[in-house]
Swiss-Prot record:
Pfam family, one: NmrA
Organism ancestry: Eukaryota, Viridiplantae, Streptophyta, Embryophyta, Tracheophyta
Gene3D superfamilies: NAD(P)-binding Rossmann-like Domain, UDP-galactose 4-epimerase, domain 1
Stated name of the protein: Bifunctional pinoresinol-lariciresinol reductase 1
Source organism of this protein record: Linum usitatissimum (Flax)
Gene that encodes it: PLR_Lu1
Binding site for substrate: 268
Binding locations of NADP(+): 10-16, 35, 44, 140
Any single biological process term in GO: (-)-pinoresinol catabolic process
CDD domains documented for this protein: PCBER_SDR_a
UniProt tissue specificity: Expressed in seeds and roots, but not in stems. Detected in leaves.
Molecular function GO labels: lariciresinol reductase activity; pinoresinol reductase activity
EC number: 1.23.1.4, 1.23.1.3
């Protein structure tokens, strides 16, 4: 792999900071966007300074200043955006980035902020969670209308949110005595170590096999059921949990009285664990789809048994 100039937008976020690290480790000239408001957050600012110590370049720009964005993207070959999808307004900020990339005319690859379920497959998703997918599709359309070279990354379930707590609603720590199994617990799900997500993302930036395609992260040993995840934890911890199966109807009933953010989470879990939206389709090269672990077999990805060890 050669040396690229990579700009990460959202580099202080949950997945963004890992992508910055992976880019540096892979020897790329790494640039991190520094937005004015970042200087008001001591933790984010210190994180940016730590990137600088590791060799990254900090580039000042603002979504409210088009010319600053154009100057930033003119510095690089690749732009990776990882702004949070938790706030829908943040996703549409990417439209400003698309305009800057279009004007600059030099970017060879743009990876927008997705990294979860494939929004192209979620047109019938439940409200209010559907809004996230709809907005991601708005960004995709803008990218494609502008003929910007791109890769969409479907990274499925981050371990920190879905594995450590055995996908339970509430705390991010493992349950100590009881666990709710969604449905019969036998729907296949894809769980990912976040650092592996970053590694696969960086490996794709110069790969023509992923150009203008959707890359799914579906390493075979991480395609397991909810019940298998729970059983893995039980074997590691030596603690047998009391299991209660929850029907789809009862699960959806949990939405009642919840705030919007909680409803979004419940809706997304429903699609993952009851409908099997991460695995109920084949990856089809004819539809410009590729799978990461097949493209990069040299990556020693983290299995969920190993991911769970830190929780013991």
């Amino acid at each position: 792999m050669g040396r690229c100039r990579v700009l990460v937008v959202g580099g202080t976020g949950y997945i963004g900071k890992r992508i910055v690290k992976a880019s540096i480790e892979h020897g790329h000239d790494t640039y991190v966007l520094k937005r004015p408001e970042t200087g008001l957050d001591i933790e984010k600012f210190q994180l940016l300074l730590s990137f600088k110590k590791q060799g990254a370049h900090l580039v000042e720009a603002s979504f409210s200043d088009h010319e600053s964005l154009v100057r930033a993207v003119k510095l690089v070959d690749v732009v990776i955006c990882t702004v949070s999808g938790a706030h829908s307004r943040s996703l549409l900020l990417q439209l400003k980035l698309v305009e800057a990339i279009k004007e600059a005319g030099n970017v060879k690859r743009f990876i927008p902020s997705e990294f979860g379920m494939d929004p192209a497959r979620m047109g019938d998703a439940l409200e209010p969670g559907r809004e996230t997918f709809d907005l991601k599709m708005v960004v995709r359309k803008a990218i494609e209308d502008a003929n910007i070279p791109h890769t969409y990354i479907s990274a499925n379930c981050f371990g920190g949110y879905f594995v450590g707590n055995l996908s339970q609603l509430g705390p991010l720590t493992p349950p100590s005595d009881k666990v709710t199994i969604y449905g019969d617990g036998n729907v296949k799900v894809v769980y990912m170590d976040e650092d592996d997500v970053a590694t696969y993302t960086i490996m794709t930036i110069e790969d023509d096999r992923t150009l203008n395609k959707t890359m799914y992260l579906r390493p075979p040993e991480n395609v397991i059921t909810h019940r298998q995840l729970v059983e893995t934890w039980e074997k590691l911890s030596g603690n047998q949990l009391q299991k209660t199966e929850l029907s789809s109807q009862d699960f959806l009933a949990l939405m009642e009285g919840k705030d919007v953010a909680e409803q979004v989470v419940i809706g997304h879990l429903y699609h993952i664990y009851y409908e099997g939206c991460l695995t109920n389709f084949d990856i089809d090269a004819a539809q410009d789809q590729v799978e990461a672990s097949s493209l990069y077999p040299e990556v020693e990805y983290i299995r969920m048994k190993d991911y769970l060890m830190i929780y013991l």
